[in-house]
UniProtKB/Swiss-Prot annotation:
Keyword Hydrolase found: no
Keyword DNA repair: no
Membrane topology: Single-pass membrane protein
Cell location: Cell inner membrane
Species per Swiss-Prot/TrEMBL record: Escherichia coli (strain K12)
Induction behaviour: Constitutively expressed.
Family: Belongs to the TatA/E family. TatE subfamily.
Upper lineage: Bacteria, Pseudomonadati, Pseudomonadota, Gammaproteobacteria, Enterobacterales
Purpose of the protein: Part of the twin-arginine translocation (Tat) system that transports large folded proteins containing a characteristic twin-arginine motif in their signal peptide across membranes. TatE shares overlapping functions with TatA.
Cross-referenced InterPro entries: TatA/B/E (IPR003369), TatA/E (IPR006312), TatE (IPR024905)
GO BP terms, alphabetized: intracellular protein transmembrane transport; protein transport by the Tat complex
Gene Ontology molecular functions: protein transmembrane transporter activity
Gene (UniProt): tatE
Protein's UniProt name: Sec-independent protein translocase protein TatE
Deletion phenotype: Disruption of tatE affects the correct localization of multiple enzymes whose precursors bear twin arginine transfer peptides. Export is completely blocked when both tatA and tatE are inactivated.
Length: 67
């Protein structure tokens, strides 16, 4: 009774296409893709900035411990 079959998924997909239309779904998909791409880019930028900051801290520590 609670199983999700291929037939049920196809019926739901057909209803979504009928309700929203292909143009709106295509636009929504493009917007979602752009949001995911922006999120991944921001995550990579944060990692790079954190690594660069750690390198600067390490260099400053080496300079301050110079005898």
């Amino acid at each position: 009774m609670g199983e999700i079959s291929i037939t049920k998924l196809l019926v739901v997909a057909a209803l979504v296409v009928l309700l929203f239309g292909t143009k709106k779904l295509r636009t929504l998909g493009g917007d979602l893709g752009a949001a995911i791409k922006g999120f991944k880019k921001a995550m990579n930028d944060d990692d790079a900035a954190a690594k660069k900051g750690a390198d600067v801290d390490l260099q400053a520590e080496k300079l301050s411990h110079k005898e």
